[in-house]
Amino acid sequence: MATGRAHRPATRSRGIPEATVARLPLYLRALTALSERSVPTVSSEELAAAAGVNSAKLRKDFSYLGSYGTRGVGYDVEYLVYQISRELGLTQDWPVVIVGIGNLGAALANYGGFASRGFRVAALIDADPGMAGKPVAGIPVQHTDELEKIIQDDGVSIGVIATPAGAAQQVCDRLVAAGVTSILNFAPTVLNVPEGVDVRKVDLSIELQILAFHEQRKAGEEAAADGAAPPVAARKQQRSTGSADQGPDGDVPAVMPA
C-alpha cells in the first residue's frame, strides 16, 4: 500500500472550500454507518439529517465532488464512501507519529478508529527515558532522540502532539525540520509553523468553555422567562385586589366627595 508521502489530497487544487472539507468526514461517518447496514441508496435529506447539516448545504458540498445523485433515487452509498474517502486521501496508508505518551497520548494510541480510516500509528514517542521500550497499545514507546530517524524511515508526514504546552513548540519545530507537513495539536498552546505546514488544534478545555457559555445563556433565558411570566395564582390575585382599588374608569381610586 502506498504511504502518505506519495500523495496529497486534491481539495486545494480543485478549489473545494475548507468548510466543505471539514464536513466531508461527517458525511463519510454517516455513509459508513449506512454501508454497514447494507443500505444501497440514501436521499440528500436523510444523509443531511444523519450528518447534522441541512440538505441544501449537503448538495452544494457534493457538487464540488462532481456528485449530484439521481433524481428520485438519491445517492449510491458505496460510491459516495469511495468518492469521499478518495478526496480525503483515505484510500491509502498514512503513517502517523504520536509525541507525548501521557494519559492523552496513550488514549490516542489505543483509539481503534485510526486504522479503519487509513491512519497507521507508526511510532509512539516520549521524552521520559523511563517510558522507552514500554508497550502502549501493543507499540513500544521510543525516546525523542529517535524522532527524526523514525520520521525519515517511515515516511511520516502527519504528527500528533500530545505533550504539555511548554514542550509543544520544540516538538513541533523538530517534526517540521524532519519533514512532517501536517500536525494535529492537542497541547493547549498556539504553534508557530512555516508556510506549507497545516496545523489542526484540538483543545478540549476550550470546547468545554464554549459549552459553559451556552449553559449560562440558557440559564439566563430561563430565569428571564420565569420573571416575565408570574404564576397563574399570582396573576389572579393581582386582578382581584386591583379591582377593589380602581375607580369607575379603572385608572385611579374612586374618591367620595366630603
From Swiss-Prot:
Stretches the record annotates as Disordered: 219-258
SUPFAM superfamilies: NAD(P)-binding Rossmann-fold domains, Winged helix' DNA-binding domain
Positions annotated to bind NAD(+): 100-105
InterPro entries recorded: CoA-bd, NAD(P)-bd_dom_sf, Rex_DNA-bd_C_dom, Tscrpt_rep_Rex, WH-like_DNA-bd_sf, WH_DNA-bd_sf
GO terms, molecular function: DNA binding; DNA-binding transcription factor activity; identical protein binding
Presence of the UniProt keyword Methyltransferase in the record: no
Gene Ontology terms: cellular component: cytoplasm
GO BP field: negative regulation of DNA-templated transcription; response to redox state
Keyword Ligase: no
Biased composition (Low complexity): 225-234
Chain residues forming the annotated DNA-binding region: 26-65
Keyword vocabulary terms for this entry: Cytoplasm, DNA-binding, NAD, Repressor, Transcription, Transcription regulation
One Pfam family cited in the UniProt record for this chain: Put_DNA-bind_N
Compartments where found: Cytoplasm
Annotated function: Modulates transcription of respiratory genes in response to changes in cellular NADH/NAD(+) redox state. Binds to the DNA sequence motif 5'-TGTGAACGCGTTCACA-3' in the promoter of the cydABCD operon. May play a general role as a sensor of cellular redox balance.
Oligomeric form and interacting partners: Homodimer.
Family of the protein in this entry: Belongs to the transcriptional regulatory Rex family.
Protein name per UniProt: Redox-sensing transcriptional repressor Rex
Organism placement in taxonomy: Bacteria, Bacillati, Actinomycetota, Actinomycetes, Kitasatosporales
